[in-house]
C-alpha cells in the first residue's frame, strides 16, 4: 500500500483529505503524516465510523498535526471499570451464552481541539478531551484531560510544563482571536504574527478595530 503523502516535509490540509462526516475541521489546519503513511481519517479511532450518532472530532483552524497523532473516539468502548468484569460481552453476538449481557457503552462527548494548536508526533488524545487555543502538545503525550489555552503539555499522562505567554498576553490573544480574521487582516498583521511581541500585535489589532 502506497504512502498517502509524497514528502515528510510537506503536510496536506485536513479539508483536502478528511472524508469522515464525524470529523469537522477549520481552515488551513494540516496533517503531516508521511512517517505513518495514512490520511488523517485514520487518526480518528472510531469503533463505528459510519454512524452519525457518535462523538464528533472538532479541530479548529491553523492547527499543525504531526505524523501518527491519534484521537480515541469510541467513548468507553463498552468497557466498564466499575463492573465486576470489563469484558464487552454485549458485543460478542456470535456467542449465545452472552445473550443476557448489558450494553456497557458510554459516549464521552465530542473531542474539541482549539485553533492554532500544535500537536507533536504520535500524541494520543483520550475521548472527550478539550484542548484550548494555542496549546502545544508534545510528541507521544497522552492527553487524558482538558488542556488550557496556550499551555505546553507533555508526558504520560500529559501534564502542563509551562504556559507559552504571560496571563495578560494570553488574555489578549484570546480576545483578538486572530484565527477568525479575514485573510486581508491576517496579511496586514503577518510581520507581527511571526514575532513574540504580543503587545505590539494587540496594539495593531486595536488600531485596525478603531478605523474599521
From Swiss-Prot:
CDD domains: LbH_XAT. The keyword Phosphoprotein does not apply. GO terms for molecular function: chloramphenicol O-acetyltransferase activity. One of its GO terms (biological process) is response to antibiotic. Disulfide bonds: none annotated. Its EC number is 2.3.1.28. The active site is at residue 79. InterPro entries: Hexapep, Trans_hexapeptide_repeat, Trimer_LpxA-like_sf. Belongs to the transferase hexapeptide repeat family. Homotrimer. This is Chloramphenicol acetyltransferase.
Amino acid at each position: 500500500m502506497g504512502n498517502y503523502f509524497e514528502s515528510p516535509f510537506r503536510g496536506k490540509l485536513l479539508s483536502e483529505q478528511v472524508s469522515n462526516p464525524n470529523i469537522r475541521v477549520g481552515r488551513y489546519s494540516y496533517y503531516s503524516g508521511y512517517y505513518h503513511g495514512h490520511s488523517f481519517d485514520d487518526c480518528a479511532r472510531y469503533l463505528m465510523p459510519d454512524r452519525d450518532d457518535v462523538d464528533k472530532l472538532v479541530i479548529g483552524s491553523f492547527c499543525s498535526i504531526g505524523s501518527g497523532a491519534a484521537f480515541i473516539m469510541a467513548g468507553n468502548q463498552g468497557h466498564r471499570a466499575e463492573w465486576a468484569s470489563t469484558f464487552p460481552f454485549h458485543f460478542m453476538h456470535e456467542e449465545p451464552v452472552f445473550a443476557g449481557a448489558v450494553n456497557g457503552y458510554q459516549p464521552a462527548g465530542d473531542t474539541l481541539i482549539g485553533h492554532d494548536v500544535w500537536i507533536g508526533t504520535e500524541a494520543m488524545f483520550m475521548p472527550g478531551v478539550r484542548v484550548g487555543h494555542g496549546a502545544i502538545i508534545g510528541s507521544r503525550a497522552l492527553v487524558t484531560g482538558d488542556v488550557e489555552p496556550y499551555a505546553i503539555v507533555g508526558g504520560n499522562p500529559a501534564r502542563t510544563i509551562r504556559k507559552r505567554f504571560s496571563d495578560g498576553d494570553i488574555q489578549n490573544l484570546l480576545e483578538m482571536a486572530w484565527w477568525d480574521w479575514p485573510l486581508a487582516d491576517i496579511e496586514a498583521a503577518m510581520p507581527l504574527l511571526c514575532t513574540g511581541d504580543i503587545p505590539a500585535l494587540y496594539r495593531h489589532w486595536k488600531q485596525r478595530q478603531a478605523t474599521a
